Amino acid sequence: MSSLEKRVFLDMALDEKPIGRIEIKLFTSEAPKTCENFRALCTGEVGMAPNNKARLHYKGNEIHRVVKKFMIQGGDITDGDGRGGFSIYGRYFDDEKFVLKHSKPYLLSMANKGPNSNSSQFFITTAPAPHCNGKHVVFGEVIKGREVVDVLDNLEVDGKSKPIAKVRIFNSGELVKKKKPSKTKEELAALEERKRQEAKKDIPDIPKSWLYRDNEERESDFSSKTESSRVRSRSKSPSNNYETRRGHMANSRGDRNRRTQRADRKDDFGIAVRGRGGVQFRRVRYVTPEHWRRNAPSKWQQGSYTHPVDLQP
């Protein structure tokens, strides 16, 4: 039920024995003035009519007319026989637009004595009533308790269509949507703590990005470590024979020797050669380049004090 939707109820009794509740949804958009009149008469919030002639309330009112396969009628709060009635706006109030039609049973409509003579009397259809279109304002529909309407429709009546048994509305009012109870401070604190725990579970330890592949690397590392641990456990197990262990040790020693031989390669000058390719040397190589010899520095010879002598290689 939305916040704008209005619902009312009529508790029915047959010969002072409750037979059920009729719940009605009001069409406040199509007939707001008529709906407000009916709602206020259900709650009795307006009080007494002018001159204290009657209380403006459906509680205790009788269903004074039943026409089988047509309608059940009530709401005469002043006389109780269909000759009276009083609205919250005065004796009568005008018709609203005849938007809705009497096209099906269980529709709520206003009873009147002619145009613009609406008061407190109403009727509920028990079958389609197209002859009422344009004369009576439809403003609601029974949504629960239709079986109660069917019981009333099948009652025995006299020559004036009045039920032989006494049918009375022993209670009426408005249905209000129940609000959720406010939570205590302890419940609110527990709810906040639960939200924090759920938030911690949802947030990963390391934030992800579209370039981040740490999860895949961790999985591959974990799988490789697991596989290596399995190999080690198998190698340490006593079920492995001696020949297998001996061959494995020989292969590992051979691998170490090959790695040592590659690392010990050096050129003619004792410089270690790096890389995996073959070692190549130039066939012609002077110890001292020509341009170095031409620019060699001069040096004084022992016993000579006049001219320096060029240093020859």
Curated annotation (Swiss-Prot):
Q: Which domain of life is it from?
A: Eukaryota
One Pfam family from the UniProt entry? Answer: Pro_isomerase
GO CC annotations? cytoplasm; cytosol
Where is the segment annotated Disordered? 216-274, 288-313
- Keyword field: Isomerase, Rotamase
User: Is this entry keyworded Isomerase?
Assistant: yes
- Catalyzes what? [protein]-peptidylproline (omega=180) = [protein]-peptidylproline (omega=0)
Composition bias (Basic and acidic residues) maps to 216-230, 253-269
Example of a GO MF term: cyclosporin A binding
Q: Which InterPro entries would you find in this protein's record?
A: Cyclophilin-like_dom_sf, Cyclophilin-type_PPIase_dom
Among the record's GO biological process terms, what is one? protein folding
Against Gene3D superfamilies, the record matches this protein to:
Cyclophilin-like
| EC number(s) stated in the UniProt entry for this protein | 5.2.1.8
**Could you tell me which residue ranges the PPIase cyclophilin-type domain spans?**
9-174
PANTHER family referenced in this protein's UniProt entry, alphabetically:
PEPTIDYL-PROLYL CIS-TRANS ISOMERASE, PEPTIDYL-PROLYL CIS-TRANS ISOMERASE D-RELATED
Query: In which family does this protein belong, per the annotation?
Result: Belongs to the cyclophilin-type PPIase family.
- The protein's role, per its UniProt record: PPIases accelerate the folding of proteins. It catalyzes the cis-trans isomerization of proline imid ic peptide bonds in oligopeptides. Thought to function as a catalyst in the folding and modification of cuticle collagens.
What is the designated name of this protein? Peptidyl-prolyl cis-trans isomerase 9
Origin species, per record, is Caenorhabditis briggsae
